[in-house]
């Protein structure tokens, strides 16, 4: 006999969990659509050569790669952005530019499993392809904020940086191993300052003074300073080199655009330590954390990638986008008790006291559905205690009872499972009114 078990880092979803996830995905999809983003789908499995060039060395170690039955070198996608580059390169002539897309799907990384981190997880990506305008960058951040608010989250911060600022810092200290250094800097939250310092010594062979100066600069943060105060504080960096100058100027323009959108200044701050480990980012980058749950890591991250299609096409299309980590958000929202705890999406359970009443019960259920009320019929004629227990377990808000009197008069008795109150022999229209209002004082 096979012992039923799930691989480490993977998970099953019971009905309650699956319902919660579906509800969150529905909410963010509505936000994406409200900004004009359209859905696309790409395969879970790609040629390895499609995915590998833009994966950092750390992510390459985490990629699920193997030979398929035809001997082809294939891999499971580790994000939805690299497949997007392949997709746009194939179809850009018919898509029309600029192209705004969103995609929701599972991705795979063989990282260490821990709370809020899985080896298979769902990403919700939204991207703006084919424009260099910082208006696109501002809109992506606007969508990030709107999406989190749609999930009833208010206490979060989008930490923003620019890859040119990081490149400029490396240039200032004469560091040539930019990609390797930034990959290590990106681990600051995970392994701490001492851990980053040790890796820079070991892997990049930097001298202590260079490491000290580098770490001092990448720890520059806006914190409680106003936007104007912070830009005044870092103005001197513009004189160091063109990368720093360009990066800071872009952030100044971005902040002007976000200000014009009247987004609360408490929701976004500059943090020079934000590097984003993926090598394809070229401009503004950002990570979003929940202020009371920073240990979960980023729940939404992204940035600008102006050369993503270079591996697939002579036409080098620009892009900017972000990815919402829905699985981490489920962990957070569960801890904050902001999730629907029901194991059903049906609002009403219809219970029959006699098998003869099922025809009427099914007609009643269909009438409720036609009125927009999700309903199900308990499949057995039982004493009422059993359907009540079933409704309590699954989370139905109402039980409609069909006994002899209700059957003969074509009415129903209605019990509110929250308040325990019951009204007998109601007309369909009266019951519909009560169910629609969800009156707790029934």
From Swiss-Prot:
CDD domains linked to this entry: HisRS-like_core (cd00773), HisRS_anticodon (cd00859)
Q: What is its EC number?
A: 6.1.1.21
An example GO biological process term is: histidyl-tRNA aminoacylation
One GO MF term on file is: histidine-tRNA ligase activity
EC top class, as a word: ligase
Q: Which family does it belong to?
A: Belongs to the class-II aminoacyl-tRNA synthetase family.
PANTHER family of this UniProt entry? HISTIDINE--TRNA LIGASE, HISTIDYL-TRNA SYNTHETASE
Q: What is this protein called?
A: Histidine--tRNA ligase
Q: Which gene encodes it?
A: hisS
